Design a protein with these regions (language model features):
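Amphipathic alpha-helical interface elements
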Residues: 1-54, 60-67, 80-101
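Short C-terminal capping segment of an alpha-helix within the protein kinase catalytic domain
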Residues: 69-72
């Protein structure tokens, strides 16, 4: 059984975002006070915002992308507008995150 290509694209987008967010978070805390596997994505995003790495606007876009990706990954309905939002914003957000550290 193969997953629909849109669902695969959403998974890849979320995977890449989480990887970059975790990279920045781990690098900031250096020696992790808690294992990063136990720091949820929401905690990592909040920390990056509080540490000044993310603006409120960028954090909002990331949260929206992650929410849309979660719907698709769990086989819930995702509109064409939502798919386009993820496709049109993920690359820019990843470039933004890659430039941090």
């Amino acid at each position: 059984m193969a997953a629909p290509s849109d669902n695969v694209d959403l998974f890849v987008a979320r995977f890449n975002l989480e990887k970059e967010i975790k990279r920045i978070w781990v690098r900031h805390v250096g020696r992790e006070p808690i294992p990063s596997d136990h720091a949820t994505l929401v905690k990592q995003l909040l920390d990056l915002y509080l540490w000044g790495y993310l603006s409120k606007d960028v954090m909002g876009v990331i949260k929206e992308i992650v929410a849309i990706c979660s719907y698709g990954i769990h086989d819930k309905s995702v509109t064409k507008f939502q798919l386009d939002f993820v496709k049109n914003n993920t690359r820019d957000v990843l470039s933004y995150l890659a430039a941090i550290w």
